[in-house]
Amino acid sequence: MQSRWLLLKNPPDHTRLRGLVHKAFTPRIVDQMRQQIQSITDRLLDAVQGDGQADLVAALAYPLPVTVIAAMLGIPAQDHDQFHVWSDDLARSLDLTDEPEVYNRAGRSAVALTDYLREIVARRRREPGADLLTALVQAEEAGGRLSEDELYATCALLLVAGHETTINLIGNGTLALLRHPDQLQRLRERPELIETAVEELLRYDSPVQLTSRLTLDRVETAPLPCLGPEVGS
């Protein structure tokens, strides 16, 4: 599954897949997503409002992204916990590790997630809904559509890419604001700065600190030679 992720593709496949996925994010879908995110966030915060204190990661940062993505894809609420498990397993496989079990678990979860999505996609073809998955199924550009395998891979990528990054952004960003109370107070007084603040927090303490890549051509960096796909950086 991972080999079909848009994130790991080069042109022209990357360009084609990106265009098709972009088609699915229509203004209607984006507005619907915004409403879903607000509703889910409010519900999670309401659940701990009267407690006096809360674990930010456990109460909000961890459950929010997968719940939102699953809802956007039209996944029934009773299956959201299973999506958390699959997302965790797949996300861990992106770390640089030499533990075989990490990749074994990711492989098993990829198979289970694909089997699950196969049924959901078939249902959306028969009964289109007002959700992102239906939009992905129906997305078309230059006469082309996502293949079945590309659909499953794209759904999995949305799940994984939005999971760990959002958890880390909420945690890192909140910690940064607590360490700089003047900036926190400024944001409280001027909530219209929130979008700029999020962009700056992404830059200041990035949710992803490292990623691996394989070079396709011979390049030199610092000043070591990288000899095409033989060397990762």
Language-model-detected regions and their locations in the chain:
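Cytochrome P450
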Residues: M1-S233
